[in-house]
């Protein structure tokens, strides 16, 4: 019938979405109110609130729910009226409008993203066995430079988030401490994208809002050392399987077959052909941008 088979899934999904929409229309407003109240409390708590914000912000990264918290702190909380009478809300908007009190939810991210996480990457590099360091060095260098320049940290964080959750918990805790200390020191800094070196340099064009931003570099050096020491000790103490420290028996392919050299790619192609029964079993070979399509005589 029309409603059966492959058509049933989208039809049923649409129906259940309508039901869930009606339910959440009543359920979500109290939840939203609770989230907003929590955000208001974090703002009113001063340095402690900014520290809690930084800690929760990192903890929510794996789920993507950190964006809910970011929206409240960066675009809703607080109010600033400029000389023209325009009202600005949120830490980011108030900072770039010249509010000298803004930045408590941004300043402490600079030492972590520009210095702390690159320190963690260096620790993971030296924690890997010497023979595997060339394999992981390029990867760790690229994500560390990305974090330093742009403040995009997810590629680096996801390298150890699931392999070593303890390290990620420590990372979240250190992030909270950084925001707490930055607020206590009276540092007011901001970013338009993220807390990387590019935004740090552009921030100097806003002297009305930027205050004590040079202290972020001092904090950065300290947090680089803290991350390097803490990650190095914890990785070795608990034998965490960070990049390059995986058990050899868990490796599915050889280093040669996993490389981008001509020899490695030839070996990988040979393994694929053998896995589908050899060249005599192949009737047709086709490919698109995402898949390799093989038609075989004996499946």
Q: Where in this protein do the model-derived segments appear?
A:
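Alpha-helical transmembrane segments of multi-pass membrane proteins, especially transporters
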Residues: 2-6, 13-17, 42, 46, ...
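Non-transmembrane accessory domains of multi-pass membrane transporters/channels
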Residues: 235-298
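Short, amphipathic, aromatic/basic-enriched membrane-interface segments that mark the entry/exit
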Residues: 107-108, 129-134, 141-145, 190
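Helix-loop-helix hairpins and the membrane-proximal interhelical loops
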Residues: 28-131
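Signature of multi-pass transmembrane helix bundles
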Residues: 1-74, 202-203, 210, 214-224, ...
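Transmembrane alpha-helical segments and their short flanking loops
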Residues: 83-102, 118-121, 126, 142-143, ...
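Generic beta-strand/beta-sheet core signal
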Residues: 12, 125-127, 161, 285-287, ...
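Hydrophobic alpha-helical transmembrane segments and immediately flanking/interface helices
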Residues: 37, 41-50, 180-183, 287-298
């Amino acid at each position: 019938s029309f409603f059966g088979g492959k058509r049933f899934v989208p039809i049923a999904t649409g129906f259940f979405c309508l039901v869930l929409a009606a339910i959440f229309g009543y359920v979500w407003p109290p939840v939203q109110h609770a989230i907003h109240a929590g955000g208001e409390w974090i703002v009113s708590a001063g340095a402690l609130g900014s520290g809690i914000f930084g800690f929760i912000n990192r903890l929510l990264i794996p789920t993507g729910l950190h964006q809910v918290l970011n929206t409240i702190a960066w675009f809703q909380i607080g109010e600033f009226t400029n000389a023209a009478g325009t009202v600005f809300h949120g830490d980011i908007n108030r900072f770039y409008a010249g509010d000298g009190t803004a930045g408590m939810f941004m300043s402490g991210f600079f030492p972590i993203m520009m210095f702390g996480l690159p320190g963690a990457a260096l620790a993971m590099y030296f924690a890997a066995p010497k023979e595997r360091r060339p394999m992981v060095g390029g990867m760790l260098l690229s994500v560390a430079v990305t974090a330093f320049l742009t403040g995009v940290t997810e590629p680096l964080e996801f390298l150890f988030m699931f392999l070593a959750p303890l390290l990620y918990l420590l990372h979240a805790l250190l992030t909270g401490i950084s925001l707490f200390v930055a607020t206590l020191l009276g540092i007011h800094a901001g970013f338009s994208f993220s807390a990387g070196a590019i935004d740090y340099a552009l921030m100097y064009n806003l002297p009305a809002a930027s205050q004590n931003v040079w202290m972020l570099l001092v904090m950065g050096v300290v947090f680089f050392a803290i991350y390097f020491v803490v990650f190095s000790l914890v990785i070795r103490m608990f034998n965490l399987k960070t990049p390059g420290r995986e058990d050899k028996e868990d490796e599915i392919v050889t280093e040669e077959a996993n490389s981008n050299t001509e020899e490695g790619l030839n070996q990988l192609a040979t393994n694929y052909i053998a896995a589908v029964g050899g060249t005599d079993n192949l009737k047709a070979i086709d490919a698109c941008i995402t898949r390799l399509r093989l038609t075989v005589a004996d499946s």
